Amino acid sequence: MKKTLLWALGLVVVMLGVVFAQGAATDGHVMSAPKDLKWGEPPPVFAKGATMTVVSGDPSKEGLYVVRLKMPAGYQIKPHWHPTDEHVTVISGTFSLGMGEKFDKATMTDLPAGGYALLPAQMRHYAMAKTAGIVQVHGMGPFQLTYVNPADDPSPHASQ
């Protein structure tokens, strides 16, 4: 009897843990048709020319976020890093990524639509839209981007 009761109690604790873990992941499902996405200016750490939409979550807060960045051909993001892992999926166009602290087009890898990259926390990297396109970025917030060379940071606070 005691073994059965302990086993049942253990099962309840495990099941509650699974339920709470699933509930912590999201407040509900998210489905978005492309026409429903609202595009606007990205955070000021991105150079002018790109637009961004938040697909889910809130990149300014702790927790999972998904954003999309729409860039014209030739748009560059100078060498930088993030304190958390960054997952990048190319939705359309060709997106080029390079690793290191110096922007070097010759060493970049082209990712076509459907391409994916995982950029671990602290990894120095840079990017360029080889053609006009959209990338989807997801990670754990709050989103932060630190330029290797502070002079590359286009945000107003960078000049202070």
Predicted regions: what is each one?
Residues 8-18:
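Bacterial N-terminal signal peptides
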Residues 52-55, 66-79:
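N-terminal post-signal-peptidase region of extra-cytosolic proteins
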Residues 30, 106, 126-160:
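Double-stranded beta-helix
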Residues 72-75, 81-102:
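Glycine- and acidic-residue-biased ligand/ion/polar-headgroup-sensing regions
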Residues 1-4:
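Positively charged n-region of N-terminal signal peptides that target proteins for export
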Residues 77-79, 97-98, 119, 124-130:
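Short beta-strand His + acidic residue motifs that chelate non-heme Fe in jelly-roll/DSBH
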Residues 20-65, 152-160:
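A short, N-terminal "cap"/entry segment at the start of jelly-roll beta-barrel domains
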Residues 58-60, 95, 101-122:
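Short acidic-glycine-tyrosine-enriched beta hairpin
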